[in-house]
C-alpha cells in the first residue's frame, strides 16, 4: 500500500490498567449498523460496562448516513471516541495510531487474528513506516450461494471447490428458464466497485496500479474487459439476470423465490436465506480458467479518534471488543479470532468453512484500490458510472473502460 500520511505519535506514560478515574465517564461509540447487528453491539457495550463499573458506553447508530455524520463530527471537533472504520486513508489524519498500545503492557496479542485482516487497517507514513489505525471487529469474504432445490430439480450435482466459471456457466444454462423468469446466476446491476474487484483480481487484473498512481492498463486491461464481457454475455444469453435494476428485484428476493440458482455475495444474505427456509449450499468462488482465486474482504474495524479525551479508556473498549467473549457475541459475521471460529466449529461447518477458506485468497499484495490512493473515492465515482454504462449498453465495453480509465486518472490527481 502506498497511501502516505504523516505519523502521529502517542504520548508517553499511557495508563493501561483499570483506572479509578474512569468512574462516571461516558465513552462514545459510533457504528453504521442497525437492526440485529446494532443490538449485538449494544450487548457488547453493556458487557464492557459491567466489567468497568461507572463507565457508560453511548452507542451512536449513524446508519446509512454514517460517513457524512462521522466526517461532520470530526470537522466540528465533536467526533466519537471509538468508531467503526473502513476507509482508513480518508480518515487517517483524524485517527489515533494504535501501535504503541499494541506493543505496550496492556497490548493485544494479534497472533489469534485471522491472517490477512490487519493490512486493511494500516497506512504507510511519509517516512516509509506503517501505522495501525484499527483493530478488526468482523469480516466476510465472498463465496457462492447455490439453491439446492433448483439443482436437485435440474438433476445437477452441487458445485464443489476448485470449480471454474465454465462450470458455473454450464450449470447456470441448465438451471435457467428465461421465459419463466428463472435464472441460473445473478449479476449485480449496480455493484460496489470494492466488491467487484474480487473478479478482476481473480482474472489477473485490478482497478489501479500497485503504486496507486494510475488506472490505465488496469481498469481497462484486457483481463478487466474479459470479466465484464463474460457477465454481459451471461445476461444476453439468458444464463443470468441483472438483478437490482428495473423490475428484476434483489438477489435475495429472487433466491428466496426459487428464481435464482446461484449468486456470489458475503455473509450478509445468509440470515435471510435461513429465515426463508431455503435449502442452500455454500462453495468457494469459481476460477477463471484455473487462475488463482482471490476474494476481497468486507471488514469492519474499530478505531480511536486522535482527539479523544479518554484514549486509554477507548483502547480498553477496543481491546474488549476484540476479546473472545465479545467476538463470540458477533453472530452475524465471521469471527476475527481463529480460536472463536474453532470453538464454534465453523471451519468444519459446510456453510461457514468456505468463507474461512477464502481468506487466504485475500492476498495482502492485492490491497483494495482505496488503500492505494487517498483520492480513490473520486475515481470510484467514474468506475461506478462506467459499470452502469456497460450493463445498460451491453456493447462497446473496451471503449467504455478506456474512457473511464482516462477520467479516473484525472480524478486521482485532483
Language-model segments: what does each one mean?
Residues 43, 47-115, 153-155, 252-254, ...:
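Extracytoplasmic "Venus flytrap"/periplasmic binding protein-like
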Residues 87-141, 199, 283, 348-351:
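Hinge/lid segment of periplasmic solute-binding proteins
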Residues 56, 152, 158, 233-239, ...:
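Conserved C-terminal helix/tail region of periplasmic/extracytoplasmic solute-binding proteins
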Residues 100-116, 161, 183-185, 205-226, ...:
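Short, solvent-exposed loop/beta-turn-alpha elements that line the ligand-binding surface or hinge
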Residues 27-43, 63, 140, 371-375:
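Extracytoplasmic "Venus flytrap"
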Residues 103, 269-279, 289-385, 413:
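C-terminal lobe and pocket-closing loops
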Residues 24-34, 55-60, 82, 133, ...:
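Short, well-ordered beta-strand elements
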Residues 171-172, 213-244:
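Glycine-centered hinge/linker elements that transmit conformational signals in sensory
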Amino acid at each position: 500500500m502506498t497511501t502516505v500520511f504523516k505519523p502521529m505519535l502517542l504520548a508517553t506514560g499511557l495508563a493501561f490498567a483499570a483506572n479509578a478515574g474512569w468512574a462516571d465517564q461516558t465513552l462514545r461509540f459510533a457504528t453504521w449498523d442497525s437492526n440485529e447487528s446494532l443490538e449485538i453491539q449494544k450487548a457488547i457495550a453493556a458487557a464492557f460496562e459491567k466489567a468497568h463499573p461507572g463507565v457508560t458506553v453511548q452507542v451512536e447508530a449513524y446508519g446509512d448516513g454514517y460517513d457524512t455524520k462521522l466526517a461532520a463530527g470530526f470537522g466540528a471537533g465533536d467526533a466519537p471516541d471509538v468508531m467503526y472504520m473502513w476507509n482508513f486513508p480518508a480518515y487517517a489524519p483524524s485517527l489515533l495510531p494504535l501501535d504503541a498500545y499494541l506493543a505496550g503492557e496492556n497490548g493485544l496479542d494479534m497472533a489469534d487474528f485471522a491472517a490477512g485482516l490487519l493490512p486493511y487497517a494500516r497506512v504507510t507514513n511519509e517516512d516509509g513506516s506503517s501505522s495501525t489505525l484499527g483493530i478488526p471487529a468482523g469480516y466476510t469474504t465472498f463465496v457462492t450461494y447455490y439453491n439446492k432445490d433448483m439443482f436437485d430439480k435440474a438433476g445437477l450435482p452441487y458445485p464443489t471447490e476448485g470449480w471454474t466459471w465454465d462450470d458455473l456457466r454450464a450449470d447456470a444454462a441448465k438451471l435457467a428458464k428465461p421465459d419463466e423468469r428463472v435464472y441460473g446466476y445473478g449479476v449485480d446491476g449496480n455493484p460496489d466497485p470494492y466488491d467487484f474487484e474480487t473478479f478482476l483480481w481473480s482474472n489477473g487484473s485490478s482497478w489501479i496500479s500497485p503504486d496507486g498512481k494510475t488506472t490505465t492498463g488496469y481498469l481497462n486491461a484486457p483481463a478487466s474487459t474479459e470479466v465484464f464481457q463474460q457477465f454481459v454475455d451471461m445476461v444476453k444469453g439468458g444464463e443470468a439476470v441483472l438483478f437490482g435494476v428495473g423490475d428484476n428485484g434483489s438477489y435475495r428476493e429472487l433466491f428466496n423465490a426459487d428464481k435464482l440458482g446461484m449468486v456470489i455475495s458475503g455473509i450478509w444474505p445468509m440470515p435471510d436465506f435461513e429465515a426463508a427456509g431455503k435449502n442452500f449450499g455454500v462453495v468457494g468462488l469459481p476460477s477463471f480458467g484455473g487462475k488463482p482465486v482471490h476474494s476481497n474482504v468486507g471488514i469492519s474495524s474499530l478505531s480511536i479518534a486522535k482527539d479523544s479525551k479518554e484514549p486509554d479508556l477507548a483502547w480498553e473498549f477496543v481491546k474488549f471488543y476484540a476479546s473472545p467473549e465479545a467476538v463470540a457475541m458477533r453472530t452475524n459475521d465471521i469471527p476475527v479470532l481463529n480460536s472463536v471460529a474453532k470453538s464454534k466449529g465453523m471451519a468444519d461447518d459446510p456453510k461457514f468453512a468456505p468463507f474461512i477458506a477464502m481468506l487466504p485468497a485475500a492476498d495482502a499484495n492485492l490491497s483494495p484500490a482505496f488503500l492505494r490512493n487517498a483520492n480513490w473515492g473520486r475515481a470510484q465515482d467514474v468506475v461506478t458510472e462506467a459499470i452502469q454504462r456497460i450493463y445498460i449498453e451491453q456493447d462497446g465495453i473496451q471503449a467504455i473502460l478506456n474512457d473511464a480509465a482516462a477520467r479516473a486518472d484525472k480524478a486521482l490527481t485532483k
